């Protein structure tokens, strides 16, 4: 027995003893309160359990009634009978658990409250009455004068009696305190033990009951799986027949890529202020965590986490020096951006570094995966960036026509692409799709930190690739782009970093090359160049600068260079517009963008046409497709219209470019825009009798309607658009339904 109060201190009646008594009384009072609360909660639990049992039994009866609905089905009847019988046995076990819990509460807790604590309180009252009597006797004995001997003798005798009575009661009370302390421990632990034993018995019985159905459940699961497959197959066949009757032309199916999530651990956590995306732009403080290749936050510990970035490989982070608040940085993903604020400059830098490191780590882990993935966790979103979206709902699946190994081999086979564009490391497995270059993993992480407005990074081995994007990468390449961005490296005597250089050296080089653009061939001041009115629509593009771009003979990059005015007399926007014309010149377009051309530059001399509209009218469909893909990758607005109210989708429809129409629809082209004559793209397609484009536009409208109703839509939409994309890339002339007299529309 653990002695809480010492009997010697009890006889001394020291202040320490009195304080100990008061402390124990407070503890016992609190114990009594909590035990009464526990009893109340236990009674509530028992009452809820009985209600649960009653509701569960009624629920089982409802399940049994399903077996008698409609024609007899032996399989369903057997299933319901076995499972309801098992559930009934489990409820019987639950009732036994409630009875055991009630018995334990009454035996242990209620007995302790009513008997143990009651006797303790009575002993306490006797003790304090004795203490009061002793205090009174001591006071009276002390107040008797010397001259009153008789009274002093009586007071002394009374004091002895009071002291003896107090000490006896004090010893009894001390014993009672020590006993109640031990009894409390024993009774509570015994209560918990009996409760756990009852729970163990209950769950053991449930386990045994369900184990008897293990084999049956396994067999039933297999049968149900087969039924679901058959039903899904029948449903899909009916939907395909339905679309076939309406459209009469459908492409074949492609296997859906598998999804796999890579491992990840906790990187950093802490409080940050987050700006809301509503109209009020309010700021709230949340607990942010970088873990499992995700950026998440929560308000309280028990709150569910909110995912800001589902896959860090799809995002970039940048500082926000122009924000009204200090210490702000922004995490940008393809679908949204999140403005965050830390408490100090140092914390802001730490968070930015942590996000960048997490991005690099995510890519490194994916690179070490022995099993190449056609579409990983988040790479489906990467595919969306190339496959774009179809209306408000968007396309949700990408396609990889030739496999990841085929894409990497095809892109790396281009002259100069077998090495990293920036550090010359062999066998690069990453690419910047808006620049058209290949990168090593370290340089790709640096490119990603620049932001998507400078470089859009994608893996050659992990992500899905649309066919038009693969062809675009093969038409550009490291040699062409480096002739633009490194034009003055030799003249400036600047040393290019190698594979063994540090990350800091590579980062400084990449920043100077793509952000500061130190090595570009300088153009005259913009005000000295012409840019308000562009050349006629059919004028050939401006040829590349001598010595700046040297394309390979026989490729899309080496078009004939007809005589033209000096490039230096053109505004970069006008140069981009000219280069997007007949036929398009991707190197010249890249040169114009490098010199700051606005990808949505408007040519006032040609009905406010944009480079994207100009590229749509190229003579060769494949050239036009790749030029449009290049402009879209660099931020071209797919819905910007000319003076006649016609956007790129209108022009593609007028010219019968089915591949371009498919590309613009995937990139979110607005189907409802009408030109100055009140015609939308579908009206034009019907008037020109272009069945392919009519099919695409009607499917897109159906997709929009499904998305507006919250429906996922039929996978047939995706199949058709993937097939048109592949056909537009492999055999574009087959899809072209243009005729020369359509220009009069």
UniProtKB/Swiss-Prot annotation:
Top-level lineage group: Eukaryota
SMART domains in alphabetical order: ANK (SM00248), ArfGap (SM00105), PH (SM00233)
GO BP terms: signal transduction
Residue numbers of 3'-nitrotyrosine PTMs: 485
Transmembrane segments annotated in the record for this chain: none
UniProt membrane topology term: Peripheral membrane protein
Region Required for formation of endosomal tubules when overexpressed with PIP5K1C, residue ranges: 1-382
Stretches the record annotates as Disordered: 525-569
UniProt function note: GTPase-activating protein (GAP) for ADP ribosylation factor 6 (ARF6) required for clathrin-dependent export of proteins from recycling endosomes to trans-Golgi network and cell surface. Required for regulated export of ITGB1 from recycling endosomes to the cell surface and ITGB1-dependent cell migration.
Name of the featured protein: Arf-GAP with coiled-coil, ANK repeat and PH domain-containing protein 1
Organism whose genome encodes this protein: Bos taurus
């Amino acid at each position: 027995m653990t002695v809480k109060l010492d009997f010697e201190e009890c006889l001394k009646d020291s202040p320490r003893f009195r304080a100990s008594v008061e402390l124990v009384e407070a503890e016992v009072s609190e114990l009594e309160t909590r035990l009464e609360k526990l009893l109340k909660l236990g009674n509530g639990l028992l009452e809820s359990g009985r209600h649960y049992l009653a509701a569960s039994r009624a629920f089982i009866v409802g399940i049994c009634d399903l077996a008698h609905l409609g024609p007899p089905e032996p399989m369903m009847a057997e299933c319901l009978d076995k499972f309801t019988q098992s559930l009934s046995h489990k409820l019987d076990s639950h009732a036994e658990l409630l009875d055991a819990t009630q018995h334990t509460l009454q035996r242990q807790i209620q007995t302790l409250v009513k008997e143990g604590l009651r006797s303790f309180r009575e002993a306490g009252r006797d003790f304090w009455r004795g203490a009061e009597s002793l205090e009174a006797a001591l006071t009276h004995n002390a107040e008797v004068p010397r001259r009153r001997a008789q009274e002093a003798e009586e007071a002394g005798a009374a004091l002895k009696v009071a002291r003896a009575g107090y000490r006896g009661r004090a010893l009894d009370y001390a014993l009672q305190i020590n006993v109640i302390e031990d009894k409390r421990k024993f009774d509570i632990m015994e209560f918990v033990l009996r409760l756990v034993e009852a729970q163990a018995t209950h769950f053991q019985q449930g386990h045994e009951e369900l184990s008897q159905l293990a084999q049956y459940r396994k067999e039933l699961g297999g049968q149900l799986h087969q039924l679901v497959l058959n039903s899904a197959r029948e449903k899909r066949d009916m939907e395909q027949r339905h679309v076939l009757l309406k459209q009469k032309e459908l492409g074949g199916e492609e296997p859906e890529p598998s999804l796999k999530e890579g491992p990840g651990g906790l990187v950093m956590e802490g409080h940050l202020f987050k700006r809301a995306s509503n109209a009020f732009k309010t700021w709230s403080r949340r607990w942010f965590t970088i873990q499992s290749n995700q950026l998440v936050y929560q308000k309280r510990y028990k709150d569910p986490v909110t995912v800001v970035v589902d896959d860090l490989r799809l995002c970039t982070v940048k500082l926000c020096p122009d924000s009204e608040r200090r210490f702000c940085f922004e995490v940008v993903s393809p679908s949204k951006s999140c403005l965050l604020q830390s408490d100090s400059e140092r914390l802001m830098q730490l968070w930015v570094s942590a996000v960048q490191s997490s991005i690099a780590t995510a890519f490194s882990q994916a690179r070490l995966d022995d099993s190449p993935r056609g579409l990983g966790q988040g790479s489906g979103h990467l595919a969306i960036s190339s496959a774009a979206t179809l209306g408000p709902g968007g396309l949700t699946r990408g396609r990889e026509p030739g496999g990841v190994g085929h894409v990497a081999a095809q892109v790396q086979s281009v002259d100069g692409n077998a090495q990293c564009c920036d550090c010359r490391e062999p066998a690069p497995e990453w690419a910047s799709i808006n620049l058209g270059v290949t990168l090593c993993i370290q340089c790709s992480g640096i490119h990603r930190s620049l932001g998507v407005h400078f470089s859009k990074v994608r893996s050659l081995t992990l992500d899905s690739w649309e066919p038009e994007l693969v062809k675009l990468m093969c038409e550009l390449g490291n040699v062409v782009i480096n002739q633009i961005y490194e034009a003055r490296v030799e003249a400036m005597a600047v040393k290019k970093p190698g594979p063994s250089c540090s990350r800091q050296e590579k980062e400084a080089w990449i920043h100077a090359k793509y952000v500061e653009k130190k090595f570009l061939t300088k153009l005259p001041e913009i005000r000295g160049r012409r840019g308000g009115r562009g050349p006629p629509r059919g004028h050939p593009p401006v040829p590349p600068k001598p010595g700046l771009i040297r394309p390979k003979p026989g490729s899309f990059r080496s078009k004939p260079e007809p005589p033209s005015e000096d490039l230096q007399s053109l505004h970069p926007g006008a140069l981009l517009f000219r280069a997007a014309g007949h036929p398009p010149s991707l190197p010249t377009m890249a040169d114009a963008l490098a010199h700051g051309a606005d990808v949505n530059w408007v040519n006032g001399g040609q009905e406010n046409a944009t480079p994207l509209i100009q590229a749509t009218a190229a003579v060769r469909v494949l050239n036009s497709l790749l030029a449009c893909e290049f402009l879209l990758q660099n931020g071209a607005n797919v819905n910007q219209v000319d003076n006649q109210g016609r956007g790129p989708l209108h022009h593609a429809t007028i010219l019968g470019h089915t591949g371009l129409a498919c590309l613009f629809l995937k990139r979110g082209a607005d189907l409802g825009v009408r030109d100055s004559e009140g015609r939308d793209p579908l009206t034009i397609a019907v008037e020109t009798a272009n069945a392919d484009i009519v099919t695409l536009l009607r499917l897109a409208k159906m997709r929009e309607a499904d998305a507006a109703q919250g429906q996922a839509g039929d996978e047939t939409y995706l199949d058709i658009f993937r097939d048109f994309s592949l056909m537009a890339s492999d055999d574009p002339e087959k899809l072209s339904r243009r005729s020369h007299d359509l220009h009069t529309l």
